[in-house]
């Protein structure tokens, strides 16, 4: 599989200097403001968290485990997955669950240390491609029958950027393909200092996709809040 990024073809096995991870927020510390994804302070915060034994408690927190379990069920609802895209891998907790069900999986993110950690966790399986990119700039020469984008888009600076990111992803979604979206609700995201959250992005996605299934998750704390929605691309392949 070939992926095109910034005019360069990136193949399946990339040199270490190209490894990246996407911004994947968590329910435990999603209040960190990320006004510019590439600022030094934000990278320092992410790198410190990634150095922990269980970054963002994605493995140990019951709410996060439930969120990932429900994301996986939504991802598998359409049947076998030939070619999937995961936008944002954090430390690989969900990647590890999704990968065995995919013939091919592409993982994109913007923080190199996150992809490095996920690759080590996954023992570098041959059917996974790792790409350093953000969601607005990434592009693929192939279409995906599944795209998973969870706890990522509210890090963008404004709704126009969110629309741009959504439009970019939908150009890579195969006819009849599914997109699984997850995010905390608007109110929580705005309380954390972000522009908006789940309801706003869902409305944007609904303009172009068909909503198939929706799940609402709530944990013990106010920060443990998530809407998960599975969408289908209504465009026919014929």
From Swiss-Prot:
Q: EC top class, in one word? A: transferase
Q: Report the EC code(s) recorded for this entry.
A: 2.1.1.-
**InterPro entries reported for this sequence:** NodS, SAM-dependent_MTases_sf, SAM-MeTfrase_NodS-like
One of this protein's GO BP terms? oligosaccharide biosynthetic process
* Keyword Methyltransferase found: yes
Q: Which GO terms describe its molecular function?
A: S-adenosylmethionine-dependent methyltransferase activity
Q: What else is known?
A: Necessary for nodulation on Phaseolus vulgaris and on Leucaena leucocephala.
**Entries under PANTHER family matching the protein:** METHYLTRANSFERASE, TELLURITE METHYLTRANSFERASE
Per the similarity annotation, which family is this? Belongs to the NodS family.
Role noted for this protein: SAM-utilizing methyltransferase involved in nod factor synthesis.
Protein name, per record: Nodulation protein S
Q: What is the lineage of its organism?
A: Bacteria, Pseudomonadati, Pseudomonadota, Alphaproteobacteria, Hyphomicrobiales
**What gene name is listed for this protein?**
nodS
